Each structure stands twice: as C-alpha cells, then as structure tokens.
Amino acid sequence: MVNIRPDEISSIIRQQIDKYDQGVQVANVGTVLQIGDGIARVYGLDQVMAGELLEFEDETIGIALNLESDNVGVVLMGEGRAILEGSSVKATGKIAQVPVGDGYLGRVVNSLGAPIDGKGDISSSDTRLIESAAPGIISRKSVCEPIQTGITAIDSMIPIGRGQRELIIGDRQTGKTSVAIDTIINQKTEDVVCVYVAIGQKAASVASIVTQLEEKGALDYTVIVAANADEPATLQYIAPYTGAAIAEYFMYKGKATLIIYDDLSKQASAYRQMSLLLRRPPGREAFPGDVFYLHSRLLERAAKLSDALGGGSMTALPIIETQAGDVSAYIPTNVISITDGQIFLSGDLFNAGIRPAINVGISVSRVGSAAQIKAMKQVAGKLKLELAQFAELEAFSQFASDLDQATRNQLARGQRLREILKQPASSPISVEEQVAIIYTGINGFLDEVPVNKVKEFVSQLRTNLKNSKPKFAESIRETKALGSDAEELLKSAIADVKQSMG
C-alpha cells in the first residue's frame, strides 16, 4: 500500500500556488457594426476617450472621433481591407502621439512619424502628443527678431518675424511653394530647424522638393512630413499636427524653428471628407462647423517663447490655394483672420513675368518693422508707398496721352524698383545685399540706367561689394544699421559699377 504523506502534498500545492501568476488584463473591447470608406462604426466601447487610438484585429489603427449614444465613429489610419463586420476592436488607452528627436533632421517621414525615405529607422529620444495645447499668454514674448526669407520683396515690405504666422496665398502655379522652399534654403547660416509638411501632394512633387533641398545643402536641418494624395484622408488630416509636434520638440529646446504647411486647403478637404462620412452636419461649402477650430488650434501653436521657457520660436508659413483669385472664400478668409498677415501671389503678375508674383497692395505683415533690422527699416520705409503710387500711375497713364515730367520720372523709377524686386527661384539674397539694392533704387541711382540693364547693374553691384568692399557687409552684420561709413562704401561701389558699365 502506497504511503500517503499529506504534508508533502500540501507543500507541493503551496509551491504551485506561489508560482501561479495569471496576469489579468482588463481590455475595453468593441465590435465592428459597419465598415466602409475609411470609417468604422463600433459598438460597445463605453469607456473610450475622444481622439483615442483603437486597434482592429488586422492591426490597423483608428481614431475615435464621434462618440455617440449607441456607437463610436472611428476613422481609419490605413486601408483596413481585412476588417470585417463583427470583428473586434480594442481601445489602446493612448491618444495619438509621435516620436520626436534630433534623429529626424534630414529625414522624410509619414503622418505617424515613420520613415519613408528608405534610410533605415530613426532613433527617437522622446514622444509628443500630436494635439497639444498652444503656449499661453504668459509663456509668450512679442515677435522681435526677423526670419530672413532671402526674397527682397518680402524682407523689405512684408517682413516675417520669429514666432509669426504668415499666410502664403494664391492660385495654383503662382510660386507659393517656391517662396516657402527659398525661405528654407536661406536658413542655412541662421541655425533654424525647418519642418516642411506636404499634404495631399503628388509623390513626385515631394521627391523633387527633397532633391532640391539636398542639392542646396538644406536637407540637413529640415524634416519633411509627407501625407501624399493617395493616402487615407485621416493621415492627410493629422499630418500638420505631426509636423507641429516635431517643431515643438525643437522649440521647447530653445531653438528657432520654421514650419511650412503645404497646403491647408487640402487638409480642410480631407477633414470635410471625414466629417461628411461620419455624418456630421455640413455647413458653408459643405465644411463642418468646426473647420475654423481645425486651423486655429494648429496655427496658435506657433509662438515666440518667453526667456523663462528658453526663448525658442516656431514660425508658421501656412499655404492656401485659391480658386481664380477668390480670397473671400470660406477657408481663405478663415486662415487670413487667424494669421498675422498674408503674402498674396497673383496669377496675372506671374504670367507677366514678375516673379516672385507678390501683389504688394493686399499683402501685409501685421508685425511690421518689429521684424526688421534697423538698416532695412532705413531704406525700405518708402518702398511700399513708391510702388503703390507707381501702380496707380501706371493704370492711369494707359488712358492719358501727355504726362508731365514729374509723372514720367515717377513711372520710370517705379519700373526700375519693380525690376530690382524680381528674383529667380532658389537664389536667396543676403540682407546686407538687399539693403544695398533697395538703397540704390529708392535714392534714384538707377534712374539713368536703362530698364533692361537694371538686372546686370544689380548683379555687378553685388559682385563689387562682395569682392572689393567686404567691410560694407561686415558693418551691417555687426551694427544692424546702415552707418555713414557703410553708406560711403555703397556710394563708391555704385559709382564704380556706373563707370564700368559706361
């Protein structure tokens, strides 16, 4: 007969109990009621948060946007072709966030921060919420430093400051993206981190921008966030917020950042598509009622931080595409009212060969001369007025047959001023050279130069100042003002060029 030892049995049972460790997981799980057009209706997610990430059985991620009494409206961040009616959905307990870090510089990523340039994984040191609160009033400082675009017409008449939001608006094919890309290229010596967000663009267009930045050596300090035209509307909708989160990482580290949203019209269209599919009530132009908030909460994140927070800044250049120059449409008026000014690019000027095609009459910077160095204020003060008077006289002179000498002189000067503001793409001009060029035009030194020779004159003047009179640029860089010594050097350079051109 087997000898039973109760104490041994009880010790074995005790050991088994001690080892027993079944982790109990409480998951918030729902069931798919309906799926289609990138939208899922889910039943049973009672504890879900607005904007929470949900995971479907095929590992597709969605965002809970509509919380209704009997179901949840979820937008998918992927194709979701394997999701079936009746399949389960799990709440992750997380709000959409994106990895951030210095490793993102020089890379192309998608709306979720994953690399799409084939250069391998990105090591990230941190994560940031895609939607985060904008800095408050106490956290901010008024805009006081310029961000030089390298485009003479903008830096002189529509100056942009660090922490400002300046809208670039115009019809298709008027050079909006060129202005933004030139601004990125001009930051090479300025220690500014740039983020370019491409929304709903062709993959070929994004590839050409990457190549252009690489050729100019500007990709090293730039992050490109791309949500191409073939991607789901959800990814096009969150791309700008992802870009803002990456820029904020650098801003809160005390760096100056520049972010370009190209373009917010396509983001609004993607949001309209999502909202209509979620059956939210449509408003003007079929946009949902909160489309203003869509853009205001994004653009309010641009700021110049106070010294206590490190003094970093985020300058935003949103781009909006108009239809046939109609700036009074819904989205353009919304964004104009949110931003601190706009640069209006005109199709007529572009076709007339005036490039950049900036319509100076309705372009404005609400920060004004606070975002300019003293030297630029000294020379550019009269420029906008002169050009406005010239435009008026030019329209009038088409009907008048005989004009007095003063009017003819003003027209001649206006033509030369317009000529010096023309600038090819991807060729930014330093602020010292801009000051020299505007000084030459505004003080009548070009009045005797034939209009077709103005470009050559300006080119020779820049070469002369760079090679023979480097002290001119040094003086402006150090003092930020056009002193009497610098002015004498400039006058002597102008005289040299006039002599050499005969």
Curated annotation (Swiss-Prot):
Keywords: ATP synthesis, ATP-binding, CF(1), Chloroplast, Hydrogen ion transport, Ion transport, Membrane, Nucleotide-binding, Plastid, Thylakoid, Translocase, Transport. The record marks S363 as: Required for activity. GO terms for cellular component: chloroplast thylakoid membrane; proton-transporting ATP synthase complex. It catalyses: ATP + H2O + 4 H(+)(in) = ADP + phosphate + 5 H(+)(out). GO terms for molecular function: ADP binding; ATP binding; proton-transporting ATP synthase activity, rotational mechanism. Pfam families: ATP-synt_ab (PF00006), ATP-synt_ab_C (PF00306), ATP-synt_ab_N (PF02874). Gene3D superfamilies: 2.40.30.20, ATP synthase alpha/beta chain, C-terminal domain, P-loop containing nucleotide triphosphate hydrolases. Its EC number is 7.1.2.2. The keyword Chloroplast applies. Its main location: plastid. InterPro entries: ATP_synth_asu-like_sf (IPR023366), ATP_synth_asu_C (IPR000793), ATP_synth_asu_C_sf (IPR038376), ATP_synth_F1_a_nt-bd_dom (IPR033732), ATP_synth_F1_asu (IPR005294), ATPase_a/bsu_AS (IPR020003), ATPase_F1/V1/A1_a/bsu_N (IPR004100), ATPase_F1/V1/A1_a/bsu_N_sf (IPR036121). PROSITE patterns: ATPASE_ALPHA_BETA. ATP binds at G170, D171, R172, Q173, T174, G175, K176, T177. NCBIfam families: atpA, PRK13343.1. Produces ATP from ADP in the presence of a proton gradient across the membrane. The alpha chain is a regulatory subunit. Belongs to the ATPase alpha/beta chains family. PANTHER family: ATP SYNTHASE SUBUNIT ALPHA, MITOCHONDRIAL. This is ATP synthase subunit alpha, chloroplastic. The lineage of its organism: Eukaryota, Cryptophyceae, Pyrenomonadales, Pyrenomonadaceae, Rhodomonas.
